[in-house]
Amino acid sequence: MLMRLVAVTLLLSAGIAAGAMSYSFVSKASGRLGGPIRFEFFRDSTTRRKTDIKSFTVSTRTADDRWKAMWSILGGSGLTQPIQYGVTPPGFTTMIRPQKLIPGRVYAGSATDGHGGSSSVTFGFDKDGTMIFPDSFDQ
């Protein structure tokens, strides 16, 4: 019984420690189809820009509710401007080449900073190419 208590205590401690090392930051998407689609990152609000992004991926939700990467970049440091869809920033490497974005589909832009931080923004485009952020994509 004592061994079980010790094992559970150790597992809980490890879970708390792992949770303490991860955090989220803010991602913002803007633009429209046919024009630049930009992604910006902020530390804890929309006033302190985050520049230490290490990976960024745009994925689309498939018909079976899975996610498929549409574009992915890796590396980098000292991001000085927003990431533009399909344009690999200096110091980054393209892992998956960009594919065409289509109205009516659901997309997610996901970023990590290499220090345990991550962020995601879910978006789509209406028929005229305007970026939308509906409450639910399941309607």
Language model regions located:
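Sec-dependent N-terminal signal peptides
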Residues: 5-14
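N-terminal non-catalytic regions of secreted/periplasmic and cell-surface proteins
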Residues: 17-64, 119-139
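Short, flexible, glycine/charge-rich loop motifs used to bind or transfer phosphoryl groups or to couple energy/partner
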Residues: 46, 96-97
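Extended, solvent-exposed segments with strong compositional bias
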Residues: 60-96
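Accessory recognition modules or surfaces
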Residues: 79, 84, 97-99, 117-124
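Short beta-strand segments and strand-loop junctions that repeat across beta-rich extracellular domains
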Residues: 97-105, 129-131
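Internal, hydrophobic beta-strand segments that form the core of beta-sheet-rich folds
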Residues: 101-115
